[in-house]
C-alpha cells in the first residue's frame, strides 16, 4: 500500500499531522475486502505479474510523481510484492516468462529477487528513488528468513546489497534464457545508498513460530522449536521431520516439533501442488505406520503454490490409505502432484486468505 501525505482533490482524508493526498492498495486477485476510505483498491497477479499488476503499479507511480521534500510516502510492504508491484524494464511477456522459469527452477527467494530487481523500474530501491526528495516511511511484514530488507518484495524502498555479478551467476546457474535487452539490465547496478528512507519491520516468521508454539501448548503439547530458518527442499524437510518423529517414538509426553521458514520445490513433473503440500506428503512416507503421529505444513497467507489450499496434513496412516487407492507417494512427488494425492485422502488444509504473510510453518505432532 502506498499513501501520499498531502491533498488529493475529492479523495482527501484526515491524517494526523498532515493531509492524505491519496493512496493505493495492491493485493492478489480475490483478496480485496472492500473499500478503505478513499484509497484506490487494485487486485493483481501472483506469483506471476499480470497486466493488472502493471496497470496498478503505473497508478502508484503516477500518484507519487512530482513529490517534494515536504511530502511523506507511507509504504506498507509484505511478501508477494515482487509480483504485485512491478514496472518492467523488459517486455512484459519476457518478464512473465523469466518469473515462471525462476519459480520452477528451485531457486530460493533471495536468488529470484536478485534477478527481479534488475528487470524492474521499482524494485531494488528504485521506487524510493522515484519518490525522492520525499521521505519514504516503509513498514514491512517480512516473509524472508533473516529479514533482509533489500529482498522482501524485492526491496522497492531499500538500498540493494546484491550486485550485477550475483545476478549473472544466478542467471547462469539456473540456465535462464534472456534476451539481449534483459542481459543488459543485469549489468545495470541498483541504488546502494538511499537517504530518504526509514524502515520498520512489524512482523516475521519468529512471531509465527511463537504463536504456533503457544497454540500447541494450549492443546496439551510441549512445543520444541527446531528452527525458524528452514530453507531446504520441501521433500528434504518432510523427510527430516519424519526422522525426528521416529527418533522420539518412546517419548512419554505429547510433543510438537515446529519448523518455520520457506522451503523450495524443484519442478520435475507437471502436477499440481505447493511446497507445503509436498513437504507434508514427503513426511507421510517417513511416518508410515507410526501411531498418534502427524505432520502438517501450511503457508501463513493461506495459499500454497497455485492452489486453493494453504498446505497439507498427514499421519501415520496416510501412505496406506493412498496405497489402497493405487497412489504411490514416490511417483506423486516425482510428478509434483501432491495436491491431488492429499485431496484423495482428505489431507488438504484450507484456511482462506489470512491477510498476512510471514513464511510457512511445519509442525510434527506426537500425542501421548
Task: Walk through the language-model features, giving the residues of each.
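Conserved small/polar residues in nucleotide/adenosyl-binding loops
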Residues: 1-5
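A glycine- and small-aliphatic-rich helix-loop capping segment at beta-alpha/alpha-beta transitions
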Residues: 10-19, 38-40, 61, 88-101, ...
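Glycine-rich, mobile lid/loop segments that gate access to catalytic sites or pores
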Residues: 62-151, 156-159, 334-337, 341, ...
Amino acid at each position: 500500500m502506498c499513501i501520499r501525505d498531502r491533498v488529493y482533490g475529492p479523495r482527501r482524508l484526515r491524517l494526523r499531522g498532515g493531509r492524505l493526498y491519496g493512496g493505493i492498495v495492491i493485493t492478489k486477485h480475490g483478496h480485496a475486502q472492500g473499500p478503505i476510505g478513499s484509497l484506490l483498491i487494485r487486485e493483481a497477479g501472483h506469483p506471476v505479474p499480470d497486466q493488472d499488476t502493471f496497470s496498478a503499479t503505473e497508478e502508484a507511480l503516477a500518484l507519487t510523481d512530482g513529490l517534494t521534500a515536504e511530502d511523506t510516502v507511507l509504504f506498507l510492504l509484505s511478501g508477494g510484492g515482487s509480483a504485485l508491484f512491478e514496472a518492467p524494464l523488459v517486455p512484459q511477456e519476457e518478464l512473465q516468462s523469466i518469473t515462471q522459469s525462476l519459480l520452477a527452477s528451485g531457486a530460493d527467494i533471495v536468488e529470484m529477487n536478485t534477478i527481479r530487481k534488475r528487470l524492474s523500474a521499482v524494485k531494488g530501491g528504485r521506487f524510493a528513488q522515484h519518490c525522492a526528495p520525499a521521505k519514504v516511511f516503509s513498514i514491512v511484514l517480512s516473509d524472508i528468513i533473516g529479514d533482509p530488507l533489500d529482498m522482501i518484495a524485492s526491496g522497492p524502498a531499500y538500498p540493494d546489497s546484491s550486485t550485477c555479478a550475483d545476478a549473472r551467476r544466478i542467471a547462469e546457474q539456473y540456465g535462464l534464457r534472456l534476451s539481449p535487452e534483459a542481459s543488459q539490465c543485469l549489468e545495470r547496478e541498483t541504488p546502494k545508498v538511499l537517504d530518504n528512507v526509514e524502515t520498520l519491520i512489524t512482523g516475521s516468521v519468529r512471531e509465527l513460530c511463537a504463536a504456533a508454539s503457544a497454540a500447541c501448548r494450549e492443546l496439551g503439547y510441549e512445543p520444541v522449536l527446531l528452527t525458524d530458518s528452514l530453507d531446504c527442499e520441501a521433500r528434504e524437510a518432510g523427510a527430516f521431520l519424519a526422522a525426528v518423529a521416529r527418533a522420539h517414538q518412546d517419548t512419554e509426553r505429547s510433543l510438537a516439533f515446529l519448523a518455520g521458514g520457506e522451503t523450495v520445490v524443484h519442478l520435475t513433473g507437471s502436477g499440481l501442488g505447493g511446497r507445503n503440500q509436498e513437504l507434508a506428503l514427503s513426511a507421510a512416507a517417513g511416518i508410515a505406520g507410526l501411531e498418534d503421529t502427524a505432520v502438517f505444513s501450511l503457508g501463513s497467507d493461506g495459499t500454497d503454490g497455485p492452489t486453493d489450499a494453504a498446505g497439507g496434513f498427514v499421519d501415520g496412516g496416510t501412505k496406506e490409505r493412498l496405497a489402497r487407492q493405487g497412489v504411490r507417494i514416490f511417483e506423486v512427488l516425482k510428478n509434483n502432484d501432491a495436491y491431488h494425492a492429499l485431496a484423495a485422502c482428505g489431507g488438504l488444509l484450507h484456511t482462506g486468505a489470512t491477510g498476512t504473510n510471514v513464511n510457512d510453518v511445519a509442525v510434527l505432532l506426537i500425542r501421548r
